[in-house]
Structure formats: C-alpha cells, structure tokens
Amino acid sequence: MLFRSTDVGAGKIELIEFFWYSCPHCNAFEPQFAAWVKAAPKDVVVQRVPVRFRDDFEAQQRAYYVFESLNMVDAMHGKLFHAIHTERQQLSTAPALAAWANKNGLPEKKFLDTFNSFGVATKARRATQLQDAFKVQGVPALGVAGRFYTDGSLTQTMDRALQVAEYLIGEVRRGR
C-alpha cells in the first residue's frame, strides 16, 4: 500500500520529512535537510509533514499548514525553529503562535483565520493519518515514495538516514 501526502504525478518520487517544531533533533537536522532540498533531484518532490503525537502538538502542526496555505513556508519555517530553540520562546498554543507570527510579518487575525480554517484542519488530519500509516515513532523521520521509512534511530544519525533515503530513491527509480 502506498502512503502519499499528495499526488506527486507520473515519474516523480515523493520524499516526506516528518518533523515537530519543538524537537531539538528536528531543529539540528533542518539546515542539512534544507540544503539537501535545494539540491534535490528534479524527479523528487519534497513534502514536510508536521507530526502530532499528542494533542498539544496540534497548534504547531497547524502553524506549518498556515504558512503553507499563505505561501510563507520559506519565510517562516526556519524562523519558528529559531524562536523555539535559540530564543527559547514557548510557542505551543494558537494565541502564542499568532502573537509570534504577528511580530514576524503575518497579521495575527490572518494567522488565526487560516489556523481555524477547514483547509488547515483537513491538512492537519491528513498529516496525522500519514504519520500513523508510516508508523512514525520519533522525529525527524523520512518517508520515501509512500512505501519506505527511515529515521535517525534506525540509522544512528540523520546524516545516514538521508543517505538511506537517497539509496531508496535510487531503488524506486530502478523500479524496485
């Protein structure tokens, strides 16, 4: 069975990064992964999927989809990691995230309206379904082509997990 975040199209291979903004390992992996994404092969479609292991993860999960819905992932994704891990801001509720977004150029009302929208709720539900389908136990983690999974605990480091993902992408290209 294939588990995909979106329909990636014929000849394309999906790579999913499962993450959580408050995860220190995800924060440490983000610069490496962002660099990899910039150099990713043309046939690889990268999707970021925020996890929800517990109910209190939902606000950050929805925040990512607010950024995505408003075409602001490039502007806000790294900033949110920085605010949480470097500035030590507590950003785990909708009001706190909305106030932070407002200080970073996204009006609070627009953030909250989008946060509470049907579209963001649907994307958040789908993200949790993908997380469950891949049986994600921890983050960061990588899903390849809707059927392969790896993470740092399986490979000892996220650098190796990325190498495994590259190998699996090659296997998918070869039809395996």
Task: Set out the residue ranges of the language-model regions.
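C-terminal cap of thioredoxin/glutaredoxin-like
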Residues: K103-R176
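Solvent-exposed, acidic/flexible segments
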Residues: G11-K12, I16, S22-E30, F53-Q60, ...
